[in-house]
Amino acid sequence: MAETKKIKTALVSVFHKDGLGELLAKLNEEGVKFLSTGGTQKFIESLGYECEKVEEVTTYPSILGGRVKTLHPKIFGGILARRDNEGDQEQMKEYEIPSIDLVIVDLYPFEQTVASGASDADIIEKIDIGGISLIRAGAKNFKDVVIVPSKAEYGVLLDILKKKGAETDIEDRKMFAERAFGVSSHYDTAIHAWFAK
């Protein structure tokens, strides 16, 4: 198996919680540590699993009515750091940045909000910033990180975990990265179409 990587820490930031329970149960069984924010963190804890708050890592609260939660160097550094790069690893130690091996995201439902006839203000609030940034960061660093970019992929990761435990190979991670850029491309195309109408 080429370039196998162990999943030790998962950042979970999702809008839709349905279908997440079984995946979290398997990750917990494999000893994976959870990191999350807001509603997702409460959901994880409601299932009986320990979950570290993103705010505890960043030492910065969620601000601007929840518009800024995960956008912080300690989170993005943990995703983007190259595990085989000595300079990156030294900086992670220096700035106490934790490695994040798995990112699970489910974006704000922009298209559904538009289709519901919501106001422009409500539609704008459903333009995901942190989530799309997490998707791009995880996909860019697929050499080291697994990115699950939507609830449609929960089952795909669950199947891998059932077969291999909390390990993935480079082919798995590249497949998720391809799907991630597909999700981000579709999402931004929908936003562009709304602005262009």
Model-derived segments and their meaning:
Residues 39-109:
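Glycine-rich nucleotide/cofactor/substrate-binding loop typically near the N-terminus or early
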